[in-house]
Regions:
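Hydrophobic transmembrane alpha-helix segments characteristic of membrane transport
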Residues: 64-100, 192-206
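Binding/recognition "hotspot" determinant
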Residues: 1-64
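Loop-to-transmembrane-helix entry motif
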Residues: 53-60, 96-100, 177-180, 187, ...
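Hydrophobic alpha-helical transmembrane segments
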Residues: 59-71, 168, 186
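Non-cytosolic segments of integral membrane proteins
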Residues: 99-192, 230-282
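Alpha-helical membrane-interface segments at transmembrane helix boundaries
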Residues: 50-58, 90-94, 98, 147, ...
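Alpha-helical transmembrane segments
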Residues: 197-214, 246, 277-281
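Alpha-helical transmembrane segments and their helix-start/interface "positive-inside/aromatic belt" motifs
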Residues: 5-15, 86-106, 209-219, 274
Length: 285
């Protein structure tokens, strides 16, 4: 998305263009990250480490599997005589086998959930008609207004553009950190997955496994909310600014930066709240 920066000869315009290019770079990076799987993220090196940790924790998970199973049998069966009943014994046996399968094939289960979420992201991208994020550029009207000001009038514009550029840079950083944080949550959940999945062995403890699966699904679906936020922002940013004649150049630029930063704040806020939105929709509290 980012091309070579061409200097306009005006420091104020160059500063705004540089800030917008930084913002566009981060949006482009987010667009790429949303279509990247954990296996391919950063060359796959992190994923290989996570897979190794997941395999190592399976030994602990199998021990917990037996513990959860025994505790579950003791709480659900009133006596040993009740356990001798064929239907009760069969039910406990099936639960243990399914819990063991969840621990053994937990990695396949989690990658399947992520693939479903990625399919939803690809569908949203296709339906939106966007192959990439629309770049935010400095409108010609604003550039003309800045170029027409004199030396004295340009002094307040310097302060306005410096403040606006700082806001844009900070918002860009917060936005990309949030998206990277989603990958870290995916990795951490995948690494410790065998332990919470082992809780399916006992009926009283199965709520732990259910909550874990729902939380992991919520992390995967955060990508859909982030993508929708970016698409909505692109529609906001595509509308041209309203330039009122007769206003001072500093006021015109300030109004433009204020509107731009407001739209960016809406996007960053939506991305930051993506986990909360998904949790509320899925009833996770």
């Amino acid at each position: 998305m980012r091309g070579d920066t061409i200097s306009s000869g005006n420091w104020i315009i160059d500063n705004l263009n540089s800030s917008l290019e930084t913002w566009n770079d981060k949006l482009s990076e987010i667009w790429t990250l949303l279509t990247t799987s954990p296996e391919n993220f950063k060359g796959g090196g992190i994923w290989n480490v996570i897979v190794g940790i997941n395999d190592a924790l399976k030994a602990i998970a199998y021990a917990l599997l037996v513990l959860f199973f025994v505790i579950g049998v003791m709480k659900t069966c009133g006596s040993f005589t009740e356990l001798k009943r064929p239907e009760v014994a069969f039910k406990c046996f099936v639960r243990f086998v399914l819990a063991q399968a969840a621990v053994t094939y937990g990695m396949e289960l989690m990658t399947a959930l992520f693939s479903i979420a990625q399919g939803a992201i690809q569908t949203i991208m296709g339906a939106s008609g966007l192959s990439a994020m629309e770049a935010s550029t400095l409108p010609a009207e604003i550039a003309t207004t800045i170029e027409d000001v004199g030396l004295l009038e340009s002094i307040p514009l310097w302060a306005v553009t410096l403040l606006g550029s700082l806001f844009i840079w900070v918002l860009s950083l917060v936005m990309i950190l949030t998206v990277y944080g989603r990958f870290f949550k995916l990795y951490m959940a995948t690494a410790i997955a065998p332990i919470p999945l082992s809780s399916f062995a006992g009926q009283p403890s199965s709520n732990i496994g259910i909550a874990f699966i729902k939380s992991y699904a919520a992390i995967c679906l955060e990508g859909c909310v982030i993508l929708l936020s970016c698409i909505i922002f692109s529609q906001f940013a595509s509308s041209p600014p309203v330039v009122t004649e007769g206003l001072a150049p500093a006021t015109v630029v300030w109004n433009y930066i204020g509107e731009l930063v407001f739209n960016m704040l809406v996007l960053v806020g939506s991305i930051k709240m993506s986990d909360r939105i998904i949790r509320e929709l899925m009833g996770l509290g």
